[in-house]
């Protein structure tokens, strides 16, 4: 039996905390949940599509994941709570095709590689706002500044998808949402290296409004960023965020979201007097990040429209205590984004998704005067969604006032072989416009062309993640061209070509009512096609296993995680090797009544010695414990 549901933006459906089931959802489209497909949930008598069976990264509008041919993974609120802790990379590394490199402890510069793509080729959004740092040399987002507190949902699309998202979506799209569960909640955690993490949130909803607010504070004495260092490099951050909506009519509503984070971290570098040997220094960095969006959304059975204006700004300052209290270097980046997106339902099976957007970005540094750029784009996708076959194809045109126009195409399809089996495939192009820093900063080159990519993947899936068992195998390839590289002293040039290809395996099973297991494995080759060398910090083998058991002892839950990473190289010449490693985490939690939960974990139980960036420290055996409350 099928139920037609209008999931209009920021409609919040309350779900019991610490329990599997439908999660808070936001959308702007008509969707079908299918009882036979095992993707319907029941909340307060309403039929809802389960949160991990919907996607926003495929087209920019909400869609059923089983109607899409692209590779998409979802991390839910329950997943984040089971994993525990402020380090979001511990959740992301469970996903296939994902590896990361970090220059020290929590809060340090963190790069996320999706299927071997450069970290800055991953588009990151928070509540629909693009949050890249336009003043960074390559314009990416530093995931070291993004903690899990206040995050309610994470979605990752693996593969080029500039058709829907424009510039930056070469490696994929990472979309995060603020937690908007109804009720009040809070958590406190303390552990190794004097690490303290506190978070609080509040969710309200009525007939015409929803509101989710949250904030948190994290601090740690940390570890030495320099692996051989004698002094620790501390980190602290406080953050605030919120998301809400108000219905003006049954079909039209106002939506708004905002986030602010203030961070400070010590780091190591090259101390005097010769500045040529890596070691302990007295340097630190402050980062202030703000983002927000205000818009309108209209939804009916025939037409969905959304429009809004968003702002993202990042300010960084670098200090050296040995040189005084004034900053030695500062950067400022800002981007304003305006967009309109929509879906016209032509019939029960045919639809057109469309949109237009404009970005105005600027950057400046201590040594570089302010520079600006404008990027305008429009796209359209024609979709067919039958009972068994779904096809989507479209095109996009972007115009950059500094580097000219660029056209992007893409297509994907899904075919349901039976109730539980489906085939899927996608082909997509990606591009990334040169950053203002690459055009006008130190070593800048105004003749740079956009980086481009062409990606293909094909897969076979069985079951659903929320069912008794699921399995997926995916083959993928991505060819990238015009990659921007820096050569001292000449500067930036379009010189590189790269290929990344491999296979992803993902599966899980609810073995018994109380025991479940999830696992993933990726084999990846990512090479520079000019030199034949492996791309730096891209391991060929990555695997993760997570097992969870809810015991009959008063709700006591036990869990274990295993992360295996193969060998890689730290540099483009493949001279410095990074040895593979294995990490084991043990987790536990127990409810104390209806409103209180105790939890704890031990990370790197075997005290493995490893590095993700040569010369930079990583955590040894560490233990943490905390408490959660809800009411």
Listing of model-derived features with the role each one plays in the protein:
Residues 249-251, 296, 347-353, 361-478, ...:
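Structural signature of Gram-negative outer-membrane beta-barrels, strongest in the C-terminal barrel
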């Amino acid at each position: 039996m099928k139920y037609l549901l209008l999931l209009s933006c920021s409609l919040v459906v309350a779900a019991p905390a610490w329990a599997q089931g439908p999660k808070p959802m936001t959308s702007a489209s008509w969707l079908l949940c299918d009882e036979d497909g095992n993707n319907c949930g029941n909340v307060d008598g309403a039929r809802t599509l389960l949160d991990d069976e919907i996607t926003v990264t495929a087209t920019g509008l909400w869609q059923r994941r089983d109607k899409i041919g692209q590779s998409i993974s979802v991390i839910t609120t329950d997943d984040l709570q089971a994993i525990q802790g402020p380090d979001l990379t511990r959740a992301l590394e469970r996903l296939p095709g994902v590896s990361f490199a970090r220059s020290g402890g929590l809060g340090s510069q963190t790069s996320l590689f999706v299927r071997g793509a450069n970290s800055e080729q991953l588009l990151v959004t928070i509540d629909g706002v693009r949050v890249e740092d336009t003043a960074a040399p390559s314009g990416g987002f530093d995931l070291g500044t993004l903690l899990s507190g206040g995050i309610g949902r994470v979605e990752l699309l693996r593969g080029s998808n500039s058709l829907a998202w424009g510039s930056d979506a070469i490696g994929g799209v990472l979309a995060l949402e603020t937690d908007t569960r109804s009720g009040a909640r809070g958590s406190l955690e303390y552990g190794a290296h004097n690490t303290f993490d506190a978070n609080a949130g509040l969710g309200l909803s009525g007939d015409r409004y929803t509101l989710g607010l949250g904030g948190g504070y994290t601090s740690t004495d940390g570890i030495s960023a320099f692996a051989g260092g004698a002094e620790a490099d501390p980190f602290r951050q406080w953050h605030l965020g919120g998301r809400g909506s108000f219905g003006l009519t049954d079909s039209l509503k106002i939506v708004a979201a905002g986030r602010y984070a203030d961070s400070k971290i010590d780091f190591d570098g090259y101390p005097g007097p010769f500045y040529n040997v890596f070691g302990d220094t007295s340097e630190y960095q402050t980062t202030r990040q703000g983002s927000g969006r205000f818009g309108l959304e209209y939804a009916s059975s025939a037409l969905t429209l959304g429009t809004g204006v968003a702002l993202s700004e990042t300010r960084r300052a670098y200090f050296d205590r040995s040189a005084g209290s004034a900053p030695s270097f500062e950067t400022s980046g800002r981007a304003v984004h305006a967009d309109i997106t929509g879906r016209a339902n032509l019939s029960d099976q045919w639809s057109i998704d469309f949109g237009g957007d404009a970005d105005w970005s600027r950057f400046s540094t201590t040594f570089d005067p302010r520079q600006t750029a404008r990027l305008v784009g429009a796209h359209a996708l024609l979709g067919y969604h039958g009972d068994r076959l779904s096809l989507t194809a479209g095109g996009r045109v972007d115009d950059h006032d500094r580097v000219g126009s660029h056209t992007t195409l893409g297509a994907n399809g899904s075919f349901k072989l039976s109730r539980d089996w489906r085939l899927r495939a996608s082909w997509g192009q990606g591009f990334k416009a040169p950053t203002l820093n690459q055009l006008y900063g130190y070593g800048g080159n105004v003749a740079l062309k956009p980086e481009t990519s062409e990606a293909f993947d094909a897969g076979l899936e069985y079951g659903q993640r929320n069912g008794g068992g699921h399995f997926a195998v995916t083959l993928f390839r991505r060819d990238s061209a015009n990659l921007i590289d820096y050569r001292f002293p000449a500067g930036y040039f379009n010189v590189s070509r790269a290929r990344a290809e491999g296979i992803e395996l993902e599966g899980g099973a609810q073995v018994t009512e109380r025991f479940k297991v999830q696992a993933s494995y990726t084999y990846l080759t990512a090479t520079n096609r000019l030199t034949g060398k492996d791309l730096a910090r891209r391991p060929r083998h990555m695997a993760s296993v997570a097992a969870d058991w809810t015991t009959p002892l008063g709700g006591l839950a036990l869990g274990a995680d295993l992360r295996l990473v193969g060998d890689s190289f730290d540099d483009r010449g493949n001279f410095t090797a990074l040895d593979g490693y294995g990490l084991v985490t043990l987790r536990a939690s127990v409810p104390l009544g209806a409103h209180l939960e105790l939890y704890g974990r031990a990370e790197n139980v075997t005290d493995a010695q490893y590095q993700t960036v040569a010369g930079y420290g990583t955590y040894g055996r560490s233990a943490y414990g905390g408490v959660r409350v809800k009411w």
